Amino acid sequence: MNTLRIYIVGVGGQGNVLASKMIGEAALSMGVPVLMSETHGMAQRGGVVESTVVLGGAQSPTISDNCADILLAFEPMEAVRALSKANADTIVITNTAPVVPFIPGGSAAYPPVDELLACLRAKVGRVIAFDARKESLEAGNPLGLNMVMLGALYGAADMPLTKESQMEAIRKNGKPAFVESNLN
């Protein structure tokens, strides 16, 4: 099996770590070798969270610059910040709904999302951008952004995982109250 390197970025509270865990669990259930790591920013909602999932015969979960096969971004600014991990062949899947950082005593200037997407498109050949927050709200699960992003990943990339293994990982790791909406 070829190695598949998935770099996942977002901000605290978006479910990045749980999403990476679900990919890893699905891989393990199928006997696919998997290595994972995560880096947390601030210990509160809004800090940067990075996860890596490497499927296949790799020796390390570290994804070097220009080596990600997939960049899965739960927040558009974080997609741009992680662009060093991408190359021309990387698939970028990004949520377009920004999480504007909290700045005590002031407000933050957030660049237009169209400008962020243009930065992504200038480096990689394939960018899939959509409002995952809106999709999760329409599905009746306001906390389901991570599941929407996983669905986009599974639909857009050639993953070595079966639908059954992915669904079982959701059942095993998801909150019982949201399992059904996460599976749909």
What are these regions (language model features)?
Residues 1-184:
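Active-site cofactor/cluster-binding pocket
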